[in-house]
Protein backbone atom coordinates (compact mmCIF):
# COMPACT_ATOMS: atom_id res chain seq x y z
CA UNK A 1 0.00 0.00 0.00
CA UNK A 2 1.47 3.37 -0.99
CA UNK A 3 1.71 6.42 1.24
CA UNK A 4 -1.28 8.22 -0.32
CA UNK A 5 -3.44 5.10 0.15
CA UNK A 6 -2.46 5.02 3.83
CA UNK A 7 -3.29 8.71 4.20
CA UNK A 8 -6.65 8.20 2.49
CA UNK A 9 -7.43 5.24 4.76
CA UNK A 10 -6.45 7.27 7.84
CA UNK A 11 -8.66 10.17 6.77
CA UNK A 12 -11.61 7.84 6.12
CA UNK A 13 -11.16 6.25 9.54
CA UNK A 14 -11.04 9.69 11.20
CA UNK A 15 -14.22 10.74 9.35
CA UNK A 16 -16.00 7.57 10.46
CA UNK A 17 -14.91 8.14 14.06
CA UNK A 18 -16.08 11.75 13.95
CA UNK A 19 -19.41 10.78 12.40
CA UNK A 20 -19.95 8.43 15.32
CA UNK A 21 -18.93 11.14 17.82
CA UNK A 22 -21.53 13.56 16.40
CA UNK A 23 -24.17 10.83 15.96
CA UNK A 24 -24.17 10.95 12.17
CA UNK A 25 -22.64 7.52 11.50
CA UNK A 26 -25.82 6.41 9.73
CA UNK A 27 -25.73 9.47 7.47
CA UNK A 28 -22.21 9.17 6.03
CA UNK A 29 -23.53 8.75 2.49
CA UNK A 30 -26.33 11.32 2.79
CA UNK A 31 -25.84 14.65 1.04
CA UNK A 32 -25.58 17.50 3.54
CA UNK A 33 -28.56 19.28 1.98
CA UNK A 34 -30.80 16.34 2.87
CA UNK A 35 -29.91 16.38 6.58
CA UNK A 36 -32.27 17.87 9.17
CA UNK A 37 -31.44 21.32 10.55
CA UNK A 38 -30.02 19.79 13.72
CA UNK A 39 -27.95 17.27 11.78
CA UNK A 40 -26.50 20.09 9.68
CA UNK A 41 -25.44 21.88 12.86
CA UNK A 42 -23.85 18.68 14.17
CA UNK A 43 -22.04 18.28 10.85
CA UNK A 44 -20.65 21.82 11.22
CA UNK A 45 -19.48 21.01 14.74
CA UNK A 46 -17.89 17.79 13.47
CA UNK A 47 -16.05 19.69 10.74
CA UNK A 48 -14.64 22.01 13.42
CA UNK A 49 -13.67 19.07 15.61
CA UNK A 50 -11.71 17.46 12.76
CA UNK A 51 -9.13 20.19 13.40
CA UNK A 52 -8.93 19.17 17.09
CA UNK A 53 -9.36 22.71 18.45
CA UNK A 54 -8.84 23.51 22.12
CA UNK A 55 -11.54 26.21 21.89
CA UNK A 56 -14.89 26.19 20.10
CA UNK A 57 -16.95 29.35 19.70
CA UNK A 58 -20.56 28.55 18.80
CA UNK A 59 -23.07 31.29 17.99
CA UNK A 60 -26.65 30.19 18.74
CA UNK A 61 -26.03 26.53 17.90
CA UNK A 62 -29.63 25.48 18.64
CA UNK A 63 -31.50 28.26 16.83
CA UNK A 64 -34.34 26.72 14.83
CA UNK A 65 -33.92 23.24 16.32
CA UNK A 66 -36.67 21.04 17.67
CA UNK A 67 -36.76 20.34 21.42
CA UNK A 68 -35.28 16.87 20.82
CA UNK A 69 -32.49 18.27 18.64
CA UNK A 70 -31.66 20.80 21.38
CA UNK A 71 -31.40 17.95 23.92
CA UNK A 72 -29.16 15.95 21.59
CA UNK A 73 -27.01 19.01 20.92
CA UNK A 74 -26.59 19.56 24.67
CA UNK A 75 -25.49 15.93 25.01
CA UNK A 76 -23.06 16.37 22.11
CA UNK A 77 -21.51 19.51 23.61
CA UNK A 78 -21.07 17.78 26.96
CA UNK A 79 -19.40 14.80 25.24
CA UNK A 80 -16.94 16.90 23.28
CA UNK A 81 -16.05 19.31 26.10
CA UNK A 82 -13.40 17.06 27.62
CA UNK A 83 -10.02 18.69 26.99
CA UNK A 84 -11.43 21.79 25.31
CA UNK A 85 -13.31 24.95 26.13
CA UNK A 86 -16.62 25.70 24.45
CA UNK A 87 -18.00 29.23 24.41
CA UNK A 88 -21.67 29.35 23.44
CA UNK A 89 -23.52 32.54 22.59
CA UNK A 90 -27.16 31.71 23.14
CA UNK A 91 -30.48 33.33 24.05
CA UNK A 92 -32.25 30.05 24.90
CA UNK A 93 -31.77 29.96 28.67
CA UNK A 94 -33.29 26.48 29.00
CA UNK A 95 -30.53 25.22 26.68
CA UNK A 96 -27.87 27.21 28.53
CA UNK A 97 -29.00 25.59 31.78
CA UNK A 98 -28.39 22.15 30.20
CA UNK A 99 -24.80 22.85 29.19
CA UNK A 100 -23.23 25.72 31.12
CA UNK A 101 -20.82 25.56 34.02
CA UNK A 102 -20.44 29.32 34.01
CA UNK A 103 -22.76 31.94 32.51
CA UNK A 104 -21.88 35.49 31.52
CA UNK A 105 -24.64 37.97 30.71
CA UNK A 106 -23.88 40.94 28.49
CA UNK A 107 -26.00 44.02 27.91
CA UNK A 108 -25.04 46.67 25.37
CA UNK A 109 -21.55 45.22 25.15
CA UNK A 110 -20.91 45.22 28.90
CA UNK A 111 -20.71 42.34 31.33
CA UNK A 112 -23.51 42.71 33.87
CA UNK A 113 -23.44 39.31 35.61
CA UNK A 114 -21.36 36.17 35.75
CA UNK A 115 -21.55 32.91 37.66
CA UNK A 116 -23.78 29.88 37.88
CA UNK A 117 -27.10 29.93 36.08
CA UNK A 118 -28.99 30.29 39.37
CA UNK A 119 -26.79 33.18 40.48
CA UNK A 120 -27.14 34.99 37.16
CA UNK A 121 -30.90 34.51 36.95
CA UNK A 122 -31.36 35.98 40.43
CA UNK A 123 -29.06 38.97 39.79
CA UNK A 124 -31.02 42.23 40.10
CA UNK A 125 -29.30 43.76 37.05
CA UNK A 126 -30.23 40.80 34.87
CA UNK A 127 -33.81 40.88 36.11
CA UNK A 128 -34.06 44.63 35.45
CA UNK A 129 -32.53 44.51 31.97
CA UNK A 130 -34.14 41.32 30.66
CA UNK A 131 -37.37 41.04 32.58
CA UNK A 132 -38.14 44.75 32.95
CA UNK A 133 -38.87 44.57 36.68
Task: Show the residue positions of the predicted features.
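Conserved ABC nucleotide-binding domain
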Residues: 18-39
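Short, small-residue-biased leader/transition segments that mark boundaries at the very start
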Residues: 1-3
Amino acid sequence: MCSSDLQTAAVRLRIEQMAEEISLQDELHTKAGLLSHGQKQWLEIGMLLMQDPKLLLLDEPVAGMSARERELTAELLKRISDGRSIVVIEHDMAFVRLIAHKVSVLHQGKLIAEGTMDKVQSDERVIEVYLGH
